[in-house]
Design a protein with these regions (language model features):
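A ligand-binding cleft/hinge motif common to bilobed small-molecule-binding domains
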Residues: 71-72, 85-93, 169-190, 195-199
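Periplasmic-binding protein-like
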Residues: 27-29, 104-107, 183-223, 242-246
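Extracytoplasmic small-molecule ligand-binding "clamshell" domains
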Residues: 18-94, 132, 229, 239
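N-terminal signal peptide c-region/cleavage motif recognized by signal peptidases
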Residues: 11-17
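Short helix-initiation/N-cap motifs at beta->coil->alpha
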Residues: 61-72, 151-162, 199
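Extended ligand-binding regions for polar small-molecule ligands
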Residues: 43-55, 115-116, 205-242
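Flexible hinge/capping segments at coil-to-helix
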Residues: 110-129
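Ligand-binding clefts/hinges and TM-proximal coupling segments of bilobed small-molecule sensing domains
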Residues: 59, 137-150, 190, 223-246
């Protein structure tokens, strides 16, 4: 048997060895990035995580949970992976990052047909009541830029419902997340319009503090391979093809 085959076999067995700590993987309910489809995890980040696990010979389960719960689980101990986190200086002190895996577009939405009226009363839109998902980069960006963020919700779906019921006037979220949130809220995506574009944010896999650096490096290496052979780009196109080009 060739030596190279034995080396590969040993590496695969080591990565899947019973003594290797299980990785608890959590995705947030944010279609099309990660979400539950008929009880099974799906989405861009989920598919990418499965591809990386295939390369590493691992089969750790992926659970879809609310962002607040995922964050608290990651803070509780090692061997936790959050599938989609924006890298910030504060989070760098708490987590280890692999990526980026895609770029999020930070957008403010208004009910379609209301924007002209809103601008007449407040040209800069800074005084309007606004909402965003709690703890998200969208909420942090809006607040940091001086917008009047009066409501933070547990999910993008709840934020969409509140916007459409006029509980607030502006909804800050990711352009890639808006269609799924609107549909789950019982509305069509074309019932809202873009009020402001606030830039982009790179999204990463985030491992909790204390997770083995060797495991994090293995994920980073597998992601580099998927990027090099074009697989990452194919997965991105599959799940984000609906986004308009700017």
């Amino acid at each position: 048997m060739p030596c190279w085959f034995l080396l590969l076999l040993c590496a695969g067995l080591a990565s899947a060895a019973p003594g290797a700590p299980a990785l608890k993987i959590y995705g947030m309910d944010s279609k099309p990035v990660s979400y539950a489809d008929a009880g099974q995890p799906a989405g861009l980040a989920v598919e990418l995580a499965h591809r990386i696990q295939d390369k590493l010979g691992r089969h750790d389960a992926i659970d879809i949970v609310p962002w607040a719960r995922a964050q608290s689980l990651a803070e509780a101990g090692p061997n936790v992976l959050l599938l989609t986190v924006v890298r910030t200086p504060e989070r760098e002190r708490q987590m280890q990052f692999v990526g980026p895996i895609f770029t999020s577009r930070v957008v403010a939405y208004a009910i379609k047909g209301r924007l002209a009226e809103l601008r007449r009363h407040d040209p800069g839109l800074y005084k309007l009541h606004a909402g965003a998902r709690r703890g998200s980069i969208f909420a942090n960006t809006a607040r940091g830029l001086g917008f009047n963020l009066t409501d933070e919700t547990n999910t993008s779906e709840i934020a969409a419902k509140m916007l459409m019921s006029r509980r607030f006037d502006l909804w800050f979220d990711g352009e890639e997340l808006m269609p799924g949130a609107m549909e789950r809220a019982g509305h069509r995506p074309d019932e809202v319009e873009v009020a402001l574009r606030l830039g982009t944010a790179e999204v990463y896999f985030a491992f909790s503090s204390g997770t083995s650096k060797e495991l994090v490096k293995a994920w980073a290496g597998a992601l580099r391979e998927l990027k090099h052979d074009g697989s990452l780009q194919k997965i991105q196109r599959k799940w984000l093809a609906f986004l308009p080009e700017h």
